[in-house]
Amino acid sequence: MGAFHATTIFAIRHNGASAMAGDGQVTFGNAVVMKHTAKKVRRLFQGNVLAGFAGSVADAFTLFEMFEGKLEQWNGNLPRAAVELAKEWRSDKVLRRLEAMLIVMDKQHLLLVSGTGEVIEPDDGMLAIGSGGQYALAAGRALKKYAGGSMTAKEIAKAALEIAADICVYTNGHIIVEEL
């Protein structure tokens, strides 16, 4: 789901609830952990939208600001704001160099937004990005399939990140989960 290292973000829509989880590790290069408690999942648009990023922190903050502006411009219409962000991100010569990916969600939609112009809504209500993304996605799918009836979206998101943190050296166990 992406070649960006040093983070894992997982999001799920399950049984009418939405949750997004991210780890707290910031890695400098390939060898040094600079921070253990970064917050990579944010609430936007009066708390009605969750956004998580993988990639360069400075680039992600630029994209968060731009995306929040698009949400304001389109009165909280998440799909429209995501498409407009992707169009601008892809067409602008400076923005095109930003190295990050976003997962954004509200109570109705879950979307992956990238700088190459993709806006993807998953079929199964789950997305993951970052170096531990594949591990978290596999764990989330298994948890939903085999324990989904007894677990909430928040519980699945947290457990998926815990499993990814056990496997991926760029993902730590300081997990922040936000839910809608």
Curated annotation (Swiss-Prot):
Main localisation: cytoplasm
Regulation of this protein's activity per its record: Allosterically activated by HslU binding.
Keyword annotations: Allosteric enzyme, Cytoplasm, Hydrolase, Metal-binding, Protease, Sodium, Threonine protease
GO biological process: proteolysis involved in protein catabolic process
Catalytic activity entry: ATP-dependent cleavage of peptide bonds with broad specificity
InterPro entries for the chain: ATP-dep_Prtase_HsIV_su, Ntn_hydrolases_N, Proteasome_sua/b, Proteasome_suB-type
SUPFAM superfamilies cross-referenced by the UniProt entry: N-terminal nucleophile aminohydrolases (Ntn hydrolases)
Its EC number(s): 3.4.25.2
Superkingdom field: Bacteria
Positions contributing to Na(+) binding: 165, 168, 171
PROSITE patterns on file: PROTEASOME_BETA_2
EC category: hydrolase
Catalytic residue list: 7
Pfam family, any one: Proteasome
GO CC entries: HslUV protease complex; proteasome core complex
Similarity field: Belongs to the peptidase T1B family. HslV subfamily.
Function of the molecule: Protease subunit of a proteasome-like degradation complex believed to be a general protein degrading machinery.
Subunit structure: A double ring-shaped homohexamer of HslV is capped on each side by a ring-shaped HslU homohexamer. The assembly of the HslU/HslV complex is dependent on binding of ATP.
Protein's UniProt name: ATP-dependent protease subunit HslV
Annotated source species: Geobacillus kaustophilus (strain HTA426)
